Amino acid sequence: MDTLSKKPEQRPEEITAILSSLDRYNPEKISILQEYATTQCADQHSDIEANLALLKLLQFQQQPNPNKEDIICNILSMALANFLTSDFTTALHVLPSYVLDSPAADTLAESIQKLFHLYTLLDGCRFPEFWAVYERDDAHADITADVADFENLVRISITRAVDISSQAIHKDVFRSWLNLSDNKFADYVKELGWKVEGETVVVPPNKENEAKPATTTESIKIEQISRLLKRTNE
C-alpha cells in the first residue's frame, strides 16, 4: 500500500509548504517537523513524506538534539502500527545501515532492532507471535509509548488485513490475532459491525475480498479461422 503519493488530510499548510520547496533540506525546519511528528503520535495519524524529510535532516544535523532518538523511534513505531503500508521499510532505508548490525552499536540501534523484529512478525502475518514477543519485553511498550493507543492501532491494521483477504475467519483464530479476552473480543467484533455465526466471524463482502471469476480473452483473426475451416474440409 503506497502512502507516499497521498497527502494526509491532517497535514498543515505549513508542512506542505516545507515539503514542496527547498525548505525540506533546511536544518532550521527540523523543530517544526519534529513538532509535527509529535502531533501525529498524539492524533494517531502518520505522514510518511514529512517523516522521511525529518529523518534525512536528522542524519546531517550538526547541533546536539536530545530528542533525536525518541523522534526516530516514534516515526518507526507509527510505521509499525501501519504495517500494511511500506512506511516502515521506507523509513528504515533512510537510516544508517549500522542500526541493524549485530550486536547493536548503541541504544538507538538496539531500539530499532527490536522494532524491526516486531515488524517482521507483523509483515509475515505471525500475529500471535507478535503479541507474545511484544509483551515479553517491557522495552517494547517503552519504545512505542509516545504513539497514542499503539496496540489498538496494530489491531486496526490486523483487522484491515482480514477485511481485504477473507470472507470468514474462525472466532478463536481472530481473537488470538487481536490478543483480546473473550469479552473484549465480542465488543470489538460488535463495534466492527461483523457477525459471529457459531464459531465463525463473518466478514462483510467488499471489493477486495469478493471472489472474482477469472476471464481470459483471446484475439483470433478472421484469416486464422478461414485457414482452420479450409483444413477441416480438405
Curated annotation (Swiss-Prot):
PROSITE patterns per record: PCI (PS50250)
Q: What family is this?
A: Belongs to the eIF-3 subunit K family.
**Quick one: a GO biological-process term for this protein?**
regulation of translational initiation
Name the record gives this protein? Eukaryotic translation initiation factor 3 subunit K
Keyword Cytoplasm in record: yes
Stored InterPro entries: ARM-type_fold, CSN8_PSD8_EIF3K, eIF3k, PCI_dom, Transl_init_fac_sub12_N_euk, WH-like_DNA-bd_sf, WH_DNA-bd_sf
Quote the subunit structure annotation: Component of the eukaryotic translation initiation factor 3 (eIF-3) complex.
Taxonomically, which superkingdom? Eukaryota
Role played = Component of the eukaryotic translation initiation factor 3 (eIF-3) complex, which is involved in protein synthesis of a specialized repertoire of mRNAs and, together with other initiation factors, stimulates binding of mRNA and methionyl-tRNAi to the 40S ribosome. The eIF-3 complex specifically targets and initiates translation of a subset of mRNAs involved in cell proliferation.
List GO molecular-function terms, semicolon-separated: ribosome binding; RNA binding; translation initiation factor activity
Location comes to: Cytoplasm
Indicate the transmembrane segments per the record.
none
- HAMAP family on file: eIF3k
Q: Which GO terms describe its cellular component?
A: eukaryotic 43S preinitiation complex; eukaryotic 48S preinitiation complex; eukaryotic translation initiation factor 3 complex; proteasome regulatory particle, lid subcomplex
> What are the leading ranks of the lineage?
Eukaryota, Fungi, Dikarya, Ascomycota, Saccharomycotina
